[in-house]
């Protein structure tokens, strides 16, 4: 009996020892594997990145950018793309920003900083297009990259770029202003690659592409006459004529792609006001007065996060009371509209495609809901909450 128990106990202890040995070996191998994975991740993170920007130039970064300077944060810059790619971490990545978001999109700025208070702590570095860009300050911030809208390339290369090149700060050009699908796609890709967020950038690009092509594919099949359209930025109020557009820039390019015939296409190079008589002579089918929040201009068209529907209706109505406008087709036929001026030249301007197409061809786009698309974009990509009034048809 004693011998049997002894043999049993011996086997039991041998099994326990073997089990412990196997567990130890497994832990060691796992630890080694983890260390190897960690080294692999670190090596990947520190691996040089080659980016092709919208100009076709190749830019090499030593690693994914962790310190970034941006321009034209109000529209057409990298700010919203970075926010969509990196979420709340965007305030840690941007080390220098221009003042246009707070200056020209006050409603958006107020709303964004309420959701993300760290935005206010990002150093202001001026704007290239306003000749206030502080090159020395930017160099002292030691950014890994600066994203520059293509539209300011000439001035940037004349006034700023040589000094940044000398300091070893790479420049990546992006372009949302031309409203070309390929340029939007390449800009998203370039920013995503620079930040090491290629997978997220692919999602963003796909969302944008799907919504835009759904509109343009349908527009290409419409054979009816194009409505004539006058678009003006209502920043100055009814008393002064604001910016209108050519057919290759911002609202003008968008309207053209969406099947509108821009009446200012041959009289403006990119953007600028026209003579009041010109609009009366052209007598457009549709008038669009674009709004935002310009608090220093109380009669300006107001839309966005801080807009009141009834008050904005009255502001829009005031534009139709300009001299001679009561005789215009668009006014008589109740074809006067507004949309937020912060929507074009951006990663979410696919909603502008939807809104313009539905405005110009309501029957063909009856199933499209641009406001629902904008809300979906905010909820899916941006670290900011959705709200406000972004589109309006004059009652």
What is each of the regions a protein language model found here?
Residues 28-31:
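C-terminal motif of bacterial Sec signal peptides marking the signal peptidase cleavage site
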Residues 33-395:
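N-terminal ligand-binding lobe of clamshell/alpha-beta domains
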Residues 3-19:
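Bacterial N-terminal signal peptides that target proteins for export
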Residues 22-24:
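Hydrophobic alpha-helical transmembrane signal-anchor segments
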């Amino acid at each position: 009996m004693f011998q049997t128990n002894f043999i049993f106990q011996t086997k039991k202890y041998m099994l326990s020892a073997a089990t412990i040995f196997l567990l130890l070996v497994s832990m060691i191998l796992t630890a080694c594997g983890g260390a190897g994975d960690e080294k692999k991740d670190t090596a990947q993170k520190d691996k040089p990145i080659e980016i092709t920007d919208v100009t076709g130039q190749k830019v090499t970064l030593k690693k994914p950018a962790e310190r970034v300077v941006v321009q034209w944060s109000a529209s057409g810059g990298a700010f919203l793309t970075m926010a969509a790619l990196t979420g709340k971490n965007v305030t840690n990545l941007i080390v220098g920003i221009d003042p246009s978001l707070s200056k020209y999109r006050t409603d958006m700025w107020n709303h964004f900083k309420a959701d993300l208070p760290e935005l206010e702590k990002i150093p202001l570095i001026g704007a290239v297009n306003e000749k206030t860009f502080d090159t020395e300050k930017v160099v002292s911030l030691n950014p890994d990259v600066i994203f520059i809208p293509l539209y300011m390339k000439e001035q940037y290369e004349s006034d700023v770029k040589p000094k940044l090149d000398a300091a070893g700060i790479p420049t990546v050009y992006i372009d949302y202003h031309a409203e070309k699908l390929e340029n939007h796609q390449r800009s998203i890709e370039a920013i995503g690659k620079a930040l090491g967020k290629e997978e997220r950038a692919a999602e963003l690009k796909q969302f944008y592409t799907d919504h835009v092509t759904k509109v343009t594919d349908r527009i290409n099949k419409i054979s009816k006459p194009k409505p004539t359209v006058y678009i003006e930025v209502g920043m100055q109020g009814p008393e002064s004529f604001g910016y209108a557009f050519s057919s290759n820039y911002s609202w003008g390019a968008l309207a053209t792609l969406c099947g509108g015939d821009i009446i200012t296409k041959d009289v403006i190079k990119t953007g600028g006001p026209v003579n009041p008589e010109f609009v009366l002579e052209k007598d457009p089918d549709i008038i669009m007065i674009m709004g935002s929040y310009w608090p220093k201009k109380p009669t300006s068209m107001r839309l966005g996060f801080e807009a009141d529907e009834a008050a904005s209706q009255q502001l829009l109505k005031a534009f139709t009371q300009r001299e001679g406008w009561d005789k215009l087709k668009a006014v008589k036929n109740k074809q006067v509209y507004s949309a937020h001026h912060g929507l074009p030249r951006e990663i979410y301007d696919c909603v502008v495609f939807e809104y313009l197409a539905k405005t110009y061809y309501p029957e063909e786009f009856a199933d499209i809901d641009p406001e629902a698309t904008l809300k979906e974009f905010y909820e899916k990509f941006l670290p900011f909450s959705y709200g406000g009034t972004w589109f309006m048809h004059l009652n």
